[in-house]
Amino acid sequence: MDIVSAEEKLRDSLLQEQISQGRIELIRLLQNDKESGKSWVAIPKGSSNRYLKVATLKRVLRDKFNHTLILESKIKHDDMNRVIIEATLSHKNGGFLSSGLAERWKDSQSSNVQKQRAIECCQTAAWGRCIKSLLAVGYDISTADEIDRSTVSDINDIKEIN
């Protein structure tokens, strides 16, 4: 039988509260029509399907958790044609929280930014899936195609944040 210390109980309680506050903030942003194009995008354009931008997810993660969580990326596969990246979130004192996996096809000659900048786009998508997995906002998880359509503006937003 595992015995949970008072410190672990307190940390878990605080983590649950931070996750709850993060969800509340993201739901508020999704419901705000003025945040269209800034915090979320409609996919397909003009539809009622609202998807949070990765830059928004990262900002809320930083605002709610400060520096208590570690977001790491690991290249799982990288060759001439494609890249697969896994992002993981863990607590700074240890303990896995969530993960996200993304795959992108490469073509440096393509006019498609997703293929030209496959590693950057793949990492952005993996981050988004990882953070959304932790905060679990909405009723679905974006498909690769949906993420592809929204990642281009995310890349520019993340550059502004970092």
Show where each model-derived region lies.
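Polyanion-binding surfaces on beta-sheet-dominated domains and ring/shell assemblies
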Residues: 1-162
